[in-house]
């Protein structure tokens, strides 16, 4: 077989896989669970848990949104804020809410113990401080803005489906070029690769998807699974928590959440690079797995685009399948469609560079976030 024949074979394989991925994306778009913004769940105690570290620019808007959502909760509800040794005005700003609103409690976090990472430790302290009578716990990140219907809709989804953990995926706000290239890959990555309804039921670790930006969990199952103590050394603690829930017989997974919450994870290219540098390596488990996944993505979503430029019809089919898959996800999650989806192959290449950067930082021990080295599990 000549080099040309081998190239054409790779193009055909990539295009076929892209078409198959598009089919799965369309299926998931039709079956993806969606919170009902008008839902009114059965009244039960709710505790919202908000870990914050150097979030002075976010905590005010975040708490305003949380309190508006608590107004719509039919049962008793409150929010506990844990200040995780902030060096800015985060604690003072949060304390002002506690003075004005009895539903807000602010506690000071203690230093991260050996063997723990910062966020799992903060969440574990919050959960320990929550009332044991709470029926539902909702973990929220400070860069998330929930809608007034968010907690009622999320709680109703949890109870009506019989699941033990639901992760309504917020709309991912992306403003700069770097954000627009990378952030849409978050929802696309699971909508294009996993059969989501099956993923809810199976205990296979590789089929667990969750997003710690907004997690709604049954309090009893959370404690039975070991809570964040069970995931204390995990960089990607949200997915690890879902796996812990499944390990004790629970069920759960990701749902659409763009109508009830929005999040801008990173503001610009530098923040985006630093954020993925500290965590992306943990998504693969090993360097060889990272190379395999990125290589497969290149074959499926970059090779066809290159071949298309050379006049390959198989390449055109593969490119259009990838772009259409992205468009379906964007339409489903209220993201930006055009012209962003046309740059899908470039997004994949940028993701590959971020993955390499993260793997190098992990190997060198230079992965850091908010002044802390991400070193557990190295």
Indicate where each model-derived feature is located.
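A conserved acidic beta->alpha catalytic loop
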Residues: 83-93, 110-111
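Membrane-embedded multi-pass helical conduit in multi-pass membrane proteins
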Residues: 289-366
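Cell-envelope/extracellular polymer assembly enzymes that use nucleotide-activated donors
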Residues: 45-47, 78
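Catalytic donor/gating beta->alpha subdomain of glycosyltransferases that bind UDP-sugars
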Residues: 158, 167-190, 220-223, 228-289, ...
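Short, acidic, metal-binding catalytic loop of nucleotide-sugar glycosyltransferases
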Residues: 64-76
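Long helical/loop segments within the catalytic core of UDP-sugar-dependent glycosyltransferases
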Residues: 28, 105-130, 153-216, 220-224, ...
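N-terminal membrane-anchoring/stem segments of glycan-assembly enzymes
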Residues: 1-42, 183-184, 192-196, 330, ...
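Acidic donor-binding/catalytic loop of UDP-sugar-dependent glycosyltransferases
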Residues: 89, 140-157
């Amino acid at each position: 077989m000549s080099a040309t024949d081998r190239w054409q074979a790779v193009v055909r394989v990539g295009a076929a896989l892209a078409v198959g991925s598009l089919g799965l994306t369309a299926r998931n778009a039709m079956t993806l669970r969606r919170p009902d913004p008008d839902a009114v769940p059965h009244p039960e105690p709710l505790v919202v848990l908000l870990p914050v570290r150097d979030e002075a620019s976010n905590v005010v808007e975040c708490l305003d949104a949380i309190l508006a959502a608590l107004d719509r909760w039919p049962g008793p509800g409150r929010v506990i804020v844990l200040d995780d040794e902030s060096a800015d005005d985060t604690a003072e700003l949060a304390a002002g809410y506690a003075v004005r609103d009895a539903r807000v409690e602010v506690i000071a976090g203690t230093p991260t113990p050996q063997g723990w990472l910062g966020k799992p430790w903060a969440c574990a302290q919050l959960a320990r401080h929550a009332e044991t009578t709470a029926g539902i716990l909702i973990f929220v990140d400070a860069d998330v803005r929930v809608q007034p219907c968010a907690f009622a809709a999320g709680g109703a989804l949890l109870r009506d489906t019989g699941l033990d953990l639901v992760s309504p995926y917020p709309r991912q706000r992306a403003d700069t070029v770097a954000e627009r290239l990378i952030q849409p890959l978050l929802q696309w990555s699971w909508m294009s690769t996993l059969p989501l309804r099956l993923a809810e039921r199976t205990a296979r670790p590789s089929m667990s998807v969750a997003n710690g930006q907004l997690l709604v969990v049954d309090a009893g199952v959370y404690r039975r699974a070991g809570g964040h103590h069970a995931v204390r050394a995990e960089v990607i603690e949200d997915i690890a928590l879902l796996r812990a829930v499944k390990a004790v017989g629970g069920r759960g997974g990701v749902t659409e959440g763009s109508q009830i919450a929005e999040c801008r994870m990173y503001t610009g290219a530098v923040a985006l690079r630093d954020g993925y540098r500290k965590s992306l390596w943990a998504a693969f488990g090993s360097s060889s797995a990272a190379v395999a996944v990125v290589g497969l993505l290149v074959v499926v979503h970059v090779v066809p685009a290159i071949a298309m430029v050379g006049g390959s019809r198989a390449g055109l089919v593969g490119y259009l399948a990838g772009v259409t898959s992205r468009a379906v996800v964007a339409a489903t999650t209220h993201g930006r469609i055009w012209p962003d989806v046309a740059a899908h192959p470039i997004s994949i290449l940028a993701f590959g560079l971020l993955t390499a950067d993260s793997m190098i930082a992990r190997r060198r021990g230079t992965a850091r976030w908010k002044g802390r080295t991400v070193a557990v599990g190295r």
